[in-house]
């Protein structure tokens, strides 16, 4: 009798373990194999009129672990899993193979059935009657073990990624806490200087010129804003809410990465007869960053530099080990530069300078650059080139030694 047509092998479904002959038919959803599968199933249905056997049909798309378990390389495939030895029939002539093997399979199954009848009369040491093992059920268990093993492997990889992200955040928090000292010290010095020279009796500052008082107040205010921003960054890192971009940080040689990008853009700047000057120290430490994301930043900044630098102009690239925890990378051009009033807004999404409204401007892609650098808990900014043009700078965390 044909059993369990088009069902998945599962420990939860009924298993006809009393059937001495047990077969698995592996199929897939390809239209080309549909007719062949139908012919195989029809032939098996004819055989069941003469002999009782167990058949389960398995869709490899739904249960790939079973296909992996049996190391199948093609479907459809018919497998005799019981009685031993196991046999696999595959290819375009499965029915022909089955016709040749069927008498032997039937004889082996009959022999096994006779042995099982003899076992029914035996008892084990505990007085229990020995029972035949369900081979199909054991296959289901094997498939489940394969699936669980795969899941464990994936979970281990996820765990490693999460640990790396936690370690990255720990280093970033340590870096930001360390960097808080500079603006705190500068603000404290300015406030202490003002406090020590203020005479409350007359309501005036002594020994301080008005211009210096204004400058000290401005410095204290500027440093307070810097501290406020850094605290916001710390809170964001602690909450883990920076989900705008997914980065996979690793040890990255940013100098080498920049030279690779320059090689890709060589035709662009040589066509305009532009000169490229690099000042990247050989001992510049590696950064802890996502190389593909940083490549995007470098391509965007260098593309803009080439675009806005006139023919025969100069593009400058420099690397600087700014602190023990930061590397600064800078790209300069000799183009028209960025007006001071626009240097903050230039990183806004789709923002263009008035002069660039008729064409693609700096704002295209710079917002992405800012998002990428911020995702690395770095900073990006622009200032003027003394020789004309603009310098774009960004910082990245140093890879821990």
UniProtKB/Swiss-Prot annotation:
The modification Phosphohistidine is found at residue 178. The keyword Kinase applies. Its EC number is 2.7.13.3. It catalyses: ATP + protein L-histidine = ADP + protein N-phospho-L-histidine. Keywords: ATP-binding, Biological rhythms, Kinase, Nucleotide-binding, Phosphoprotein, Transferase, Two-component regulatory system. PROSITE patterns: HIS_KIN. SUPFAM superfamilies: ATPase domain of HSP90 chaperone/DNA topoisomerase II/histidine kinase, Homodimeric domain of signal transducing histidine kinase, Thioredoxin-like. GO terms for biological process: circadian rhythm. GO terms for molecular function: ATP binding; phosphorelay sensor kinase activity. InterPro entries: HATPase_C_sf, His_kinase_dom, HisK_dim/P_dom, HisK_dim/P_sf, KaiB_domain, Kinase_SasA, Sensor_HK_Regulatory, Sig_transdc_His_kin-like_C. Residues 175-400 form the Histidine kinase domain. Disulfide bonds: none annotated. Coiled coil: none annotated. Pfam families: HATPase_c, HisKA, KaiB. PANTHER family: SENSOR HISTIDINE KINASE RCSC, TWO-COMPONENT HISTIDINE KINASE. Member of the two-component regulatory system SasA/RpaA involved in genome-wide circadian gene expression. One of several clock output pathways. Participates in the Kai clock protein complex, the main circadian regulator in cyanobacteria, via its interaction with KaiC. KaiC enhances the autophosphorylation activity of SasA, which then transfers its phosphate group to RpaA to activate it. In addition to its output function, recruits fold-shifted KaiB (KaiB(fs)) to KaiC to cooperatively form the KaiB(6):KaiC(6) complex (independent of SasA kinase activity). Homooligomerizes. Interacts with KaiC. Participates in the KaiABC clock complex, whose core is composed of a KaiC homohexamer, 6 KaiB and up to 6 KaiA dimers. SasA and KaiB(fs) compete to bind to KaiC. The N-terminus interacts with KaiC, while the C-terminal histidine kinase domain autophosphorylates and is probably responsible for self-oligomerization. The N-terminal domain stimulates the C-terminus to autophosphorylate. This is Adaptive-response sensory kinase SasA. The gene is sasA.
